[in-house]
Structure formats: C-alpha cells, structure tokens
C-alpha cells in the first residue's frame, strides 16, 4: 500500500542498507517477506503484489520481449554508472580512457538498437517495467551527463515526451537540477 524511500550512502560501511543487503547495492526493497535486492527481483515482487500481469506480462513472447528490454536497459545503466564512478573515484589524469570508451560504446550501440526498434509509447496504456526502466535510464543519462542520447536517438526523445506527459506522477519523480528537456516542462 505504501512505499517509503530512504536515502542511503552506499559507501558508508555501517549503513542500514548494507545490513539489509550484504552487497550494499541499491535498490533494496524491504517487505514483510524480508529484504529484496536487484531491480528485476523487486519488479517481480511489485508486480505480484499488484496482482500480476501489470508490470510484466504473465507469460509467453510478450514477457520475453519486456525482459529482454529490461536486460538491455540494465546494461546501459551499468555502463553509465561505471562511467560516473570512473570520473568520481579516480583523480583526473588517472582515469582509464579505454574503460570510458568501452562503456560509452555499450551505451551508444544499445541506444542505436533501441532507436532502430522505433518504439512508440501508447498513451492509453499502463507502462510496463521496460517502459518505466527506459524512462528512468534516459533521465539518468541526462542527470549524470554521461552521454548525449537526445542527439543520437531522436525517436527516443519523442517516446520520452509521450511517456512523461502520459504517465501520471512521473515528472514529480525527477531529481532537482536536471537539465531542461521537452518532457520536463
């Protein structure tokens, strides 16, 4: 019925998050069943709590398609986070350019793949887990300024605009200070 969002410092050795999730990664979702970690596990649980077949199709090819998009989006996020960490944790001049290039290549190829899919957001439907993940990932790329995806993937700009203007409450989830984009107005 209710979700409390608790900010955590993943680098803090004695954090509550590390007590709940031995990996110390985010997100961690605490339920009556205990702590759940990994976005995919959490999505499965939320879908089940909501009665199923809402965030993830129940079975068959549609489910596989959604799960494949989720895996691609997770991979883009992993690459983006590694780029952010390389810049944040290594002093300037000690960053490994080949690592940055390799991760940017993953993002570039993956966005080109999504661009080729000619995705369109159906304004009348409830978003599935891949839709939500795609929106969050695109806004994360903007927020961290990891990759200029808007120029590389113009159809995703259109998709994002349709998503953000159709999904109730999405704009309220955006972090402060994120650059102005058409869907944030």
Give the residues covered by each predicted segment:
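GST-like domain detector, emphasizing the conserved glutathione-binding G-site
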Residues: 1-97
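Serine-centered coil/turn micro-motif
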Residues: 10, 60, 128, 154, ...
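Non-transmembrane alpha-helical segments in soluble domains
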Residues: 43, 47, 67-70, 111, ...
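Short, hydrophobic secondary-structure boundary micro-motifs
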Residues: 53-58, 93, 123, 150-151, ...
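A short, terminal or domain-edge coil/loop segment
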Residues: 55-68, 109-118, 136-144, 173-185
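GST-like fold's C-terminal all-alpha helical module
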Residues: 73-161
């Amino acid at each position: 019925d209710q979700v409390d969002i608790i900010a955590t410092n993943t680098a803090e050795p004695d954090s509550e998050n590390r007590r709940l999730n031995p990996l110390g990664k985010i997100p961690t979702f605490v339920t009556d069943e205990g702590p759940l970690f990994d976005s995919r596990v959490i999505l499965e649980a939320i879908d089940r709590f909501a009665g199923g077949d809402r965030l993830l199709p129940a079975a068959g090819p549609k489910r596989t398609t959604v799960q494949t998009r989720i895996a691609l989006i997770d991979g883009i996020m992993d690459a983006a986070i590694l780029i952010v960490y390389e810049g944040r944790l290594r002093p300037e001049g000690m960053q490994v350019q080949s690592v940055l290039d390799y991760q940017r290549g993953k993002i570039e190829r993956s966005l080109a793949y999504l661009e080729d899919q000619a995705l369109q957001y159906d304004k009348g439907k409830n978003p599935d887990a891949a839709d939500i993940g795609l929106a969050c990932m695109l806004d994360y790329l903007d927020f961290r300024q990891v990759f200029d995806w808007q120029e590389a993937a113009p159809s995703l700009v259109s998709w994002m605009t349709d998503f953000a203007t159709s999904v109730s409450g999405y704009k309220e989830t955006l972090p402060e200070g994120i650059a102005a984009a058409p869907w944030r107005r």
